[in-house]
């Protein structure tokens, strides 16, 4: 009553008196309800008191921390209950397990989402092999490189080998400047040219060593061999190996002559 008295007394301070929007009453005939408390929102609302459907709802001027109840909550609850009783209307159910498809007017999910679900097939159950399980096929690249164990070996063309052999015949040790020029002319890197010259020098040393071994073998076969024991020497004399046998046999013959 005190609040209504202040509203009627001083209209300048309260130009728009506070009243519930559902009551079509004039400001003079407005009678406020029970006094509202600041901590009223913390209490639970008990329906049916004084048969007032808006009893216990704070006015807008008091700034209730909770938003008023929406009118479409009841319809939302019925829709949720109907959806729970019929789970086949959801679009996220896989088509293999539930043959029912979502209706266009259900409002849950558009039909485009349900149509984008991929159809399961026996081929989809196959697992793709890992990279290390796949069979490795040696790829023949056009750069002329082949893989030997853990290193790459450059396969030189006939033209490249011919030019490198010419340069090696001129000088077995190539200079830095000539190495750069030859690499640019043959389409190789300086490192490849350097490695080719190193391998070529090693091959030449191996060939020269083999030639020296072949030349030393005929000289060793022409050396004179010692004569066998008991064979006559070059002047018709016996070898020294028969001399002990003659000396040992002479005393025996002497003893036999003087025996009685």
UniProtKB/Swiss-Prot annotation:
Q: Where is this region: Interaction with 5-mCpG DNA?
A: 191-202
GO biological process: what's one of them?
Answer: cell differentiation
The keyword ATP-binding appears for this protein? no
Which parts pass through the membrane?
A: none
Q: Which residues bind DNA?
A: 149-208
* Keyword tags: Activator, DNA-binding, Homeobox, Nucleus, Transcription, Transcription regulation
Pfam families the record matches: Caudal_act (PF04731), Homeodomain (PF00046)
Keyword DNA-binding recorded: yes
Places the protein is found? Nucleus
Gene3D superfamilies on file: Homeodomain-like
Gene Ontology MF, one: DNA-binding transcription factor activity, RNA polymerase II-specific
Q: Which GO terms describe its cellular component?
A: nucleus
> Which portions of the sequence form the region Interaction with DNA?
152-173
Where in this protein does the record put region Disordered?
204-260
Under the heading SMART domains, the entry gives: HOX
Q: Which domain of life is it from?
A: Eukaryota
Record field: compositional bias (Low complexity): 213-223, 240-252
* Biological role: Plays a role in transcriptional regulation. Involved in activated KRAS-mediated transcriptional activation of PRKD1. Binds to the PRKD1 promoter. Could play a role in the terminal differentiation of the intestine. Binds preferentially to methylated DNA.
Family in the record:
Belongs to the Caudal homeobox family.
Could you tell me what this protein is called? Homeobox protein CDX-1
């Amino acid at each position: 009553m005190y609040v209504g008295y202040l509203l009627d007394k001083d209209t300048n301070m309260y130009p728009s008196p506070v009243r519930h929007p559902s009551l079509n009453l004039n400001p003079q005939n407005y009678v406020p309800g029970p006094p509202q408390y600041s901590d009223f929102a913390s209490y639970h609302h008990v329906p049916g008191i004084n048969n007032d459907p808006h009893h216990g709802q704070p006015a807008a001027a008091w700034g209730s921390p909770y938003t008023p109840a929406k009118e479409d909550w009841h319809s939302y609850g019925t829709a949720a209950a109907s959806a729970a009783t019929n789970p086949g209307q959801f679009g996220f159910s896989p088509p293999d397990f539930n043959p029912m498809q979502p209706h266009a007017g259900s409002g849950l999910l558009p039909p485009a989402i349900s149509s984008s679900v991929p159809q399961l097939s026996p081929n989809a159950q196959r697992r793709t092999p890992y990279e290390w399980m796949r069979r490795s096929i040696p790829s023949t690249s056009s750069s002329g490189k082949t893989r030997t164990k853990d290193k790459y070996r450059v396969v030189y063309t006939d033209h490249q080998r011919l030019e490198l052999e010419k340069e090696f015949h001129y000088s077995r040790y190539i200079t830095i400047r000539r190495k750069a020029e030859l690499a640019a002319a043959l389409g190789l890197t300086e490192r490849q040219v350097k490695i080719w010259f190193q391998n070529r020098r090693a091959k030449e040393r191996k060939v020269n060593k083999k030639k020296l071994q072949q030349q030393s073998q005929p000289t060793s076969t022409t050396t004179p061999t010692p004569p066998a024991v008991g064979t006559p020497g070059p002047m018709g004399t016996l070898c020294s190996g028969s001399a002990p046998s003659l000396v040992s046999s002479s005393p025996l013959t002497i003893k036999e002559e003087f025996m009685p």
